[in-house]
Each structure stands twice: as structure tokens, then as C-alpha cells.
Curated annotation (Swiss-Prot):
Outcome of swapping S140F: In n2570; Defective enteric muscle contraction
Keyword field: Cell membrane, Disulfide bond, Ion channel, Ion transport, Membrane, Receptor, Signal, Synapse, Transmembrane, Transmembrane helix, Transport
Source species of the chain: Caenorhabditis elegans
InterPro entries: GABAA/Glycine_rcpt, Neur_chan_lig-bd, Neur_chan_lig-bd_sf, Neur_channel, Neuro-gated_channel_TM_sf, Neuro_actylchol_rec, Neurotrans-gated_channel_TM, Neurotransmitter_ion_chnl_CS
Record protein name field: Gamma-aminobutyric acid receptor exp-1
Annotated TM spans: 315-335, 345-365, 374-394, 494-514
């Protein structure tokens, strides 16, 4: 027991000695950041929305995390206050010393990020824009929009940011951290025809931006953007159509008197396309234009990126054109079938092409004009329907021919029976004459009538046959006004089949070779090729 107590006391003494020995921690970097952050009274934290028409006033976030209106600043403090905590915690591109020097430089020149840069001549600030399209994910005619991912780069000169390279270790260009976008003036660029923007979250791997400043005060800002933009389509020539989709770039709040956008020239081309493959379209052309847009608040400078998409008709051929053509050919084959189920087959064929038309309408947008595919499916449906009408006529002709044949057979049988009766009567009279020894014995009146009136009877029989035939002809002529024979039916059947076949072939040649060139596609004035400033290479 005493040994256990001694061991516990020894352990307690060792732990006490270890706690009393504290290794000093390197707090220099942390204290250095605290000193810099305490050097400023206010921390800037701007919203992502650019300053412009209808923009909310600038805000700063207090120590309690609540957004408050910025208090009035003295003249010496009227510049962009840096959020040093975000700068240093994220670890800028440059060293802490260079970052501190740039912050002191902004303080010394009393830089105000809310003020538009002013040139010496009082001209507007020119913003040079270049776009690199990395991917176009989808072009949808149902929702009439398209999705694309691009690298957007804009460059402008701010005379207030000119610096002496000696202040930054003789560097002619500074690579600034993306958090400096809160401290410098930026054009309030927006895309007028954008429906949605799927930008990645900040500080994520997919969200990166680039910010550079050279000694002349020229800024270069680049970032990755993902957009879904509307594209008004004309589907008159579907599936042989070409669609013109555009991407607008404009300042939201600054008129052309303050900010003018123009396409970049020189090392950074205005538009560049990576190797892009689309399932339903091919990019035929891509070019850029610029123009002025007038609003109630003034004139604004706008840039356009124009894409010309040519539809790949493979999907429509496999899903619509080939099945509808097969249905038409099947309707022709059923006309040559001599079965009682040919009408059921034709009804099934009509239901098949009707279902094909309904499924096509479900995948297309509701428009008020006729599309090229509507014409093709309509002609196929008309041919199948006319084939059904032709089948009914042929069946009617066949029944009439059978009725005519049956009536003729009955008349021939009646005439043959009367002829046999007359021959039998003649034979009986001759036998009676021989039995009388060839004398001139008068014969019975009945036999006399049968012997003396055979020619008249034959005439009457012939007259009855002619009358019956005339009655049959008049009855059929009342129905069809022509004499229907087996030859007539086969001739009608053959001629109609040839008309269907050659008519459909001529229609297909006209539809695929001539019709796509008859329609004149209207050109958007904003994407007039004659005004294009740059054409991108298509890979």
C-alpha cells in the first residue's frame, strides 16, 4: 500500500514539472497580421453585384457580422479599404511584404474604387474584351437556349494606378490576388441575354480568376464563367436549318460617355474557340461585332459574340424520316396482298404514322408556322391515306366483277336448259313420225307447236338473253357509268401504284435538294457578317 502511494506521488510530480516547462510558440506571423489589420479602421466587403443602375449603396460588415451602411469617411480615408483578413488568410500570390506595399500604395494615392477612371483628355474608359470559349454543352430548340463555358478577359487602363517599379522591387507587372477585386474599380459587365449563370463557388478549385496590374496602370482581369443564354430560333427549315445564336456583353450602369467596350487586338485575339463537338449541331462560323444600344437612360456600348450552328440531320433521319418512309412503302406492299386482312393492315399503318407524328410534336416547341418536317410527315400521311382509299375502290371493283360474272353464268345456264328442252322435243316428234310409217298422219297440236316454232323460240331465247344483258349493263352503268372488267381493275391498280411511287420519289428529290434553298433566312442586324471585326478559327 505504501509502495502504491509512493508511485502515484512520483507521477504527479513529473506531470507538474512538465506543465511548468512551456516551449515558446512562434507568434510573429500572427501578431504581424493583427498589427496590419488593426492599422485600418474599416474593412471593405463588396457585394458580387456591380455598381450601376439601381445598385444598392456600399456596405461594410461590422464585428458582429451585420451589414451596415458605410459611415462618411474623411478625405484622407476616402479610398478602398482592404479586407486584410481575407487577403492574408487566403495567402496572396505575392509575399506579405509586397501585399503590404500595395495596400499602402492604395492608401497613399487615396484610391476610390467607386470612381470611374478618368483620362487626361476626359474621354471614356475603353475596356478591351477577349473571349475564349472552352465548351458549348447543349443547343436546345425546345427551350431555345444554349449553354456554354468561357474564359472572359477584360483589360482597361486606370491612370490612378500608375506606379514606380522601384516601389515593388523593379517589377513591371504585379500579379494580384483575386480578393483585390473588392478594392479596385471594375466595369459592371453583364450579359443581356443570359438566362442563368452557373458560376462555381468562391475559393473552389473550379472557380479561379486572374488579376494583373502593370506599371502604366493597365489592369487585366480574367475569370471562368458558365452561362445559359437565350437563342431565338427560326425552325422553318427544320431539320435543315441553321441557327444564329449571340452572346451580348454590355455595361449595366455606365453609358458610352463613361465606358466603351471594344474587342481586343494583338496578342489576345478577340475570340478563340477550343475544339468543340456537339451532338446535334456543328459550329459553322463564329465572329464578333459591336454596336451601340439605346435605352431610356442613355446609349450603351455592347459587344456581340455570334455563333452560326448548322444542324446535323442524323437524328431526324433515324428517328423520323426513315420510319415514316418505311411506313409509306409498307402501305404500298399491303395493296398487292390478296387477303381479307388488308383493310386491318392499312388501318394499322395509318395508326403507326399517326403515332409517329404525335411523338414528333412532343419533342418540338409549339410554333405558329409550318416546319419542313411537318411537310414531309404530312405528305407521308396523305399517301398512306390515299392508299387506303385506293384499296377500298379496288375491293369495290372486285365485288362488282364477281356479281357481273355470277349473273352472266345464270343466264347462260337458263339458255342452255331451254335449248336442251327443244332438242328433246324434236327428238320425240321424229320418233313418232317414224312409227306412223311415214304417212301423212297429222301430228298433235302440241308437237306441231314444238316443231314449227323452234326458230321463233330461239329468237325469243336470244331476245331474253339480250334483254338480261342489257338490264345488267344498265344497272352497272348506273353505278359506275363505265363497264368494269378484270382488265380495267388491274389497269387502275397498276397506274395508281406507279403514280404513288414516282410521285413520292419526285417529292423526295424536291424536298431534300431544292426546298432547303428556297427559304430566305433573316439576318440579325447585330450579327451582320459585313460588320464582323474578327472571325474565329473552327477546329
Amino acid at each position: 500500500m505504501s509502495a502504491s502511494i509512493l508511485i502515484l506521488a512520483t507521477c504527479h510530480q513529473v506531470l507538474a514539472d512538465f506543465n511548468s516547462y512551456v516551449v515558446p510558440q512562434p507568434h510573429a506571423q500572427r501578431d504581424h497580421r493583427q498589427d496590419i489589420s488593426q492599422h485600418y479602421d474599416y474593412l471593405m466587403e463588396e457585394n458580387d453585384e456591380p455598381l450601376g443602375r439601381g445598385a444598392a449603396p456600399s456596405k461594410y460588415r461590422s464585428s458582429h457580422g451585420q451589414a451596415q451602411h458605410r459611415p462618411e469617411m474623411t478625405e484622407s480615408e476616402n479610398f478602398a479599404q482592404p479586407n486584410t483578413e481575407s487577403v492574408f488568410s487566403s495567402g496572396g500570390v505575392d509575399s506579405y511584404g509586397e501585399t503590404r506595399d500595395f495596400l499602402q500604395f492604395l492608401r497613399r494615392i487615396q484610391y476610390d474604387h467607386r470612381q470611374v477612371p478618368e483620362n487626361e483628355k476626359g474621354e471614356a474608359t475603353y475596356v478591351e474584351v477577349s473571349v475564349v470559349v472552352s465548351n458549348i454543352r447543349a443547343v436546345s430548340e425546345v427551350t431555345m437556349d444554349y449553354a456554354l463555358e468561357l474564359f472572359y478577359r477584360e483589360s482597361w487602363r486606370d491612370p490612378r494606378l500608375q506606379y514606380d517599379r522601384k516601389l515593388f522591387k523593379n517589377k513591371t507587372e504585379l500579379a494580384l490576388h483575386e480578393s483585390y477585386t473588392n478594392f479596385l474599380w471594375f466595369p459592371d459587365t453583364f450579359v443581356p441575354n443570359a438566362i442563368a449563370s452557373k458560376n462555381p463557388q468562391r475559393n473552389s478549385i473550379s472557380h479561379r480568376s486572374l488579376l494583373r496590374l502593370d506599371e502604366t496602370g493597365k489592369l487585366l482581369y480574367s475569370r471562368r464563367i458558365s452561362l445559359v443564354c437565350e437563342c431565338t430560333m427560326d425552325l422553318t427549315l427544320f431539320p435543315f436549318d441553321k441557327q444564329l445564336c449571340k452572346l451580348g456583353i454590355e455595361s449595366y450602369g455606365y453609358t458610352a460617355d463613361h465606358v466603351v467596350y471594344k474587342w481586343s487586338k494583338g496578342a489576345r485575339t478577340a475570340l478563340e474557340l477550343k475544339k468543340i463537338r456537339l451532338p446535334d449541331f456543328t459550329i459553322q462560323e463564329a465572329y464578333v461585332t459591336s454596336q451601340m444600344e439605346s435605352y431610356a437612360t442613355g446609349n450603351y456600348s455592347r459587344l456581340y459574340v455570334c455563333f452560326v450552328f448548322s444542324r446535323s440531320s442524323g437524328f431526324c433521319f433515324l428517328q423520323l424520316i426513315i420510319p415514316s418512309t418505311a411506313v409509306v412503302i409498307t402501305s404500298w406492299v399491303s395493296l398487292w396482298m390478296e387477303t381479307e386482312t388488308e383493310f386491318q393492315d392499312m388501318i394499322s399503318i395509318i395508326l403507326a404514322i399517326t403515332f409517329l407524328i404525335f411523338s414528333y410534336n412532343e419533342m418540338m416547341p409549339r410554333v405558329s408556322y409550318i416546319k419542313a418536317m411537318d411537310i414531309y410527315l404530312g405528305v407521308c400521311f396523305m399517301i398512306v391515306f390515299l392508299s387506303l382509299i385506293k384499296l377500298a375502290l379496288v375491293k369495290y371493283m372486285r365485288q362488282k366483277i364477281m356479281l357481273t360474272s355470277d349473273s352472266g353464268n345464270s343466264l347462260r345456264e337458263m339458255s342452255q336448259m331451254s335449248t336442251r328442252q327443244r332438242l328433246r322435243a324434236r327428238k320425240t316428234s321424229n320418233m313418232n313420225f317414224r312409227n306412223n310409217g311415214g304417212g301423212s298422219i297429222p301430228i298433235n297440236e302440241e308437237h306441231q307447236q314444238m316443231l314449227t316454232v323452234p326458230n321463233g323460240e330461239d329468237k325469243m331465247a336470244n331476245g331474253d338473253d339480250k334483254e338480261a344483258n342489257n338490264n345488267g349493263k344498265s344497272h352497272l352503268s348506273d353505278m359506275l357509268e363505265i363497264r368494269i372488267t378484270q382488265r380495267t381493275m388491274h389497269r387502275f391498280h397498276w397506274i395508281s401504284q406507279m403514280l404513288f411511287f414516282f410521285g413520292f420519289v419526285i417529292f423526295c428529290l424536291f424536298y431534300f435538294l431544292i426546298y432547303p434553298n428556297l427559304h430566305i433566312v433573316s439576318v440579325d442586324p447585330a450579327c451582320d457578317k459585313n460588320l464582323a471585326e474578327w472571325f474565329a478559327d473552327i477546329y
